[in-house]
Amino acid sequence: MVNVRERVSLKVGINSNAPAELLSFNGLESGKEHIALIFKDAYKAFVPLVRMHSECLTGDGFHSTRCDCGEQLDETIEIMAELGGIILYLRQEGRWGLGLYNKIDAYKLQSQGMDTYEANNHLGFDDDLREFSEAAQMLTALGIKDIRLVTNNPKKIKDLQQNGINIVEVVGTKAHLKEGNEGYLKAKASHGRHCFNFDK
């Protein structure tokens, strides 16, 4: 059974320097060190705002132009610093859970003309290897069943619902277009059915 292991206060956010609480968990079957970042005691809210964010070293840490992961994380932190909410930061590197080295191999193939899905398939992987059952278990450990989910990804909605989480509302993020990631975002929209508004 998943339960809260430890919690500590800290400040986060490039612009906001917002107070938050960082939580670790016991009982995660994968052994991965997933964490929760909680703003304004959001777990006490009737229907908290929640985002699941898969670790992306190149985007989150190095601000790579190949994806929009860092921008999505920064956007969510700023929103939740103001409104409250929970970020479940999932240690499944790469948007498809490939692992870092396989992700680098996929980048190489993308440089040769493949889109992100074609590159992953060429390496022998399915479109999306991530699964979100442990995210649902983390929410359950916090006593949360009903959420407002911040996502553009229909797979996240489906996986959480299949694991007993009731999604009251879906809140989209912006399409963070920049030099180098337009093809990536459009592949997610056309192939992965992600819901983007490219006019924003």
From Swiss-Prot:
One of its GO terms (cellular component) is cytosol. Its cofactor is Zn(2+). It is an enzyme of class 3 (hydrolase). CDD domains: GTP_cyclohydro2. GO terms for biological process: riboflavin biosynthetic process. Zn(2+) binds at C56, C67, C69. Keywords: GTP-binding, Hydrolase, Metal-binding, Nucleotide-binding, Riboflavin biosynthesis, Zinc. GO terms for molecular function: GTP binding; GTP cyclohydrolase II activity; zinc ion binding. Signal peptide: none annotated. Its EC number is 3.5.4.25. PANTHER family: 3,4-DIHYDROXY-2-BUTANONE 4-PHOSPHATE SYNTHASE, GTP CYCLOHYDROLASE II-RELATED. Catalyzes the conversion of GTP to 2,5-diamino-6-ribosylamino-4(3H)-pyrimidinone 5'-phosphate (DARP), formate and pyrophosphate. Belongs to the GTP cyclohydrolase II family. This is GTP cyclohydrolase-2. It comes from Photobacterium phosphoreum. The lineage of its organism: Bacteria, Pseudomonadati, Pseudomonadota, Gammaproteobacteria, Vibrionales. The gene is ribA.
